[in-house]
């Protein structure tokens, strides 16, 4: 355990050093809206808020959609960098809720309490698959999102996304990792649901060698307003990749038409979440 923690600390120190080495994003670089950042309790312990904010700034991440297990991490990072952080509420009190939250009554109480105390733009990111979307606790979560005017950030298969829309046809959903689906399936879902947007976090199949792969390129050009990039710092060590992910994203985005690249890099995130957060203040 101590050895693993030591490795994590070294990696996180490397994250800050790498970010500083890159320096602020050059004018020619695209700003990045990172739509998939977590700052959970173990990350807070290993990378204090001031250092985490420095990683984001030096990587040229001008805005980040942040959720955490538990929410205290998000609130600490928001207090440190309010010009960057846009908060969403993850329905997890601890990491243990990742797999069992859909059947844990205490999750509802937790979400209700946090919504009364703080402001958010979305509920998520949450893990939800298939028919579990129709269980009472996920249904209550959807009701709360509707009540508070929040988006849903779903780490879900297409089936669960469909079930969420059946419960709330007007829902606005950010589909985490684009469901890890192939581009043709993502296309089907985007065509069917005009309020569905997709993040590309924790996947690399959409680009290689500094260029989008052909099927994904077609999809990005067909739906330029519906995609966002994201790192997914689901464990503390992933913070090491925030600068590298931003750099890698800029490389393949620059192969797209400039207006499309700008939308996916940061304008879509600003239009969807930046605008929503401005209304909450």
Task: Report residues per predicted region.
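Active-site metal-binding loops of divalent metal-dependent hydrolases
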Residues: 37, 126, 178, 231-233
């Amino acid at each position: 355990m101590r050895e693993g923690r030591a490795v994590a600390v070294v990696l996180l120190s490397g994250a800050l050093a790498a970010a500083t080495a890159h320096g602020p994003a050059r004018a020619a670089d695209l700003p990045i809206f990172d739509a998939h950042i977590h700052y959970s309790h173990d990350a807070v312990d290993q990378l204090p808020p001031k250092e985490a904010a420095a990683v984001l700034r030096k990587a040229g991440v001008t805005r980040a959609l942040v959720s955490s297990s538990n929410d205290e991490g998000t609130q600490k990072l928001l207090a440190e960098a309010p010009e960057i952080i846009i908060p969403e509420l993850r329905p997890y009190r601890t990491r243990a809720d990742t797999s069992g939250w859909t059947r844990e009554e205490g999750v509802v109480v937790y979400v209700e309490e946090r919504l009364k105390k703080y402001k958010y733009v979305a509920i998520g990111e949450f893990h939800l698959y298939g028919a579990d979307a129709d269980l009472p606790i996920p249904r209550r979560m959807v009701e709360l999102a509707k009540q508070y005017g929040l988006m849903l950030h779903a780490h879900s298969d297409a089936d669960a996304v469909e079930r969420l829309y059946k419960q709330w046809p007007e829902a606005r959903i950010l589909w985490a990792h684009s469901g890890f689906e192939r581009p043709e399936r993502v296309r089907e879902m985007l065509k069917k649901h005009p309020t569905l947007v997709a993040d590309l976090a924790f996947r690399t199949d959409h680009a290689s060698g500094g260029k989008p792969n052909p099927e994904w390129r077609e999809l990005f050009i067909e739906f330029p307003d519906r995609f966002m990039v994201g790192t997914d710092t689901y464990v503390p060590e992933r913070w090491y990749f925030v600068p590298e992910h931003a750099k890698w994203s800029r490389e393949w985005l620059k192969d797209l038409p400039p207006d499309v690249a700008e939308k996916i890099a940061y304008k879509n995130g600003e239009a969807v979440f930046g605008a929503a957060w401005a209304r909450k203040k």
